[in-house]
């Protein structure tokens, strides 16, 4: 409207008048472009800092010699660990996971249960003490060699943006299609896969977002079955599933445990670990109690209190 009067009076030509009218649009477009560029720059700097953080990490050390042991007993000897300096998660944790037995770990949230699995898989290095597999300390063994001996089924399942078949094949790249399908039958996922339009060639989407939580969990178990490692780590595999999927996953885990393996299982409900060969009860970063279900109930300690509380809730 400011330019309308001069234009109407003939003192402003039509081209200039149109340019003035369009000026706010140009300014808005420029402001939007600047905002997009600044956002891109901010994201670029975040990515740059993350990359530099990885590059500045100490180079991984350890022998690349295969980890060959007669047994797969796991021993923690006075192990300490902190994610943040000065805030210990594990404090002189000492225990043994017997070879080819099922050991369950229970305890309060944040007591260090998942940390134990991460240290066994060598996702992190212990800040003190010694972790051994088959009597051989893994402190100076490359993480890659340790992971060759380990299969892990975690709460948060990572899947590649690939087909179901190839996601499972990542566990053992030379596996045949028949071996993959056999593993899926054991993991209770063959039936739902075959119901899909493309079957085993169905894309999972980025990080498996085209599948439900229970389906992702069973595919992860199929990978563990296919890999057939001597050590199996299970981290609260049924923690966030509905009843139907939880039952299917529990059956898949039961099939997985048929083979003689050294198994360490974390569970949020005690009922699924009461038949374990050994139960470790975590408390304040240490092993507060250990024993079988019956032995721990007889002690009348932390485990017995947790069991009684769970029974009251389910009654």
Segments (PLM) and residue ranges:
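Two-component histidine kinase transmitter core
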Residues: 57-58, 124
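Conserved E/DxxT/N motif and adjacent residues on the DHp alpha2 helix
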Residues: 53, 60, 169
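Juxtamembrane "helix exit" motif at the C-terminal ends of alpha-helical transmembrane segments
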Residues: 1-8
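ABC-type nucleotide-binding domain
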Residues: 69-315
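Hydrophobic alpha-helical segments in the permease module
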Residues: 1, 14-36
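Cytosolic ends of transmembrane helices, especially the final helix of ABC transmembrane type-1 domains
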Residues: 26-54
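Pre-NBD coupling/linker segments of ABC/ABC-like ATPases
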Residues: 58-69, 296
């Amino acid at each position: 409207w400011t330019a309308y009067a001069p234009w109407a009076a003939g003192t402003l030509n039509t081209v200039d008048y149109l340019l003035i009218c369009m000026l706010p649009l140009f300014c808005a477009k420029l402001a939007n472009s600047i905002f997009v560029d600044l956002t891109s720059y901010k994201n670029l700097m975040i990515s740059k800092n993350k990359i530099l953080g990885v590059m500045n990490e100490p180079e991984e050390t350890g022998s690349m010699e295969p980890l060959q042991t007669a047994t797969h007993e796991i021993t923690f000897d006075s192990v300490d660990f902190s994610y943040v300096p000065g805030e210990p998660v594990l404090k002189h944790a000492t225990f043994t996971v017997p070879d080819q037995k099922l050991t369950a770990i229970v305890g309060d949230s944040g007591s260090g249960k998942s940390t134990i699995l991460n240290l066994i898989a060598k996702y992190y290095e212990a800040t003190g003490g010694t972790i051994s597999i088959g009597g051989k300390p893994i402190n100076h063994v490359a993480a890659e060699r340790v992971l060759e001996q380990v299969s892990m089924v975690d709460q948060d399942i990572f899947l590649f943006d690939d087909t179901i078949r190839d996601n499972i094949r990542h566990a053992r790249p030379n596996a045949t299609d028949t071996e993959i399908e056999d593993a899926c039958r054991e993991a209770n996922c063959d039936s739902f896969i075959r119901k899909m339009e493309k079957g085993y060639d169905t894309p999972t989407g980025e990080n498996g977002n085209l599948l439900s939580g229970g389906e992702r969990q069973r595919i992860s178990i199929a990978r563990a079955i296919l890999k057939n490692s001597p050590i199996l780590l299970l981290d609260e595999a049924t923690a966030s599933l509905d009843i139907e999927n939880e039952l299917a996953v529990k059956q898949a885990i039961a099939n997985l445990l048929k083979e003689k393996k050294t198994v360490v299982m974390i569970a949020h409900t005690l009922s699924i670990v009461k038949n374990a060969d050994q139960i470790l009860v975590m408390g304040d970063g240490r092993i507060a109690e250990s024993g079988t279900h019956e032995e721990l109930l007889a002690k009348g300690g932390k485990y017995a209190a947790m069991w009684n509380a769970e029974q009251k809730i389910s009654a």
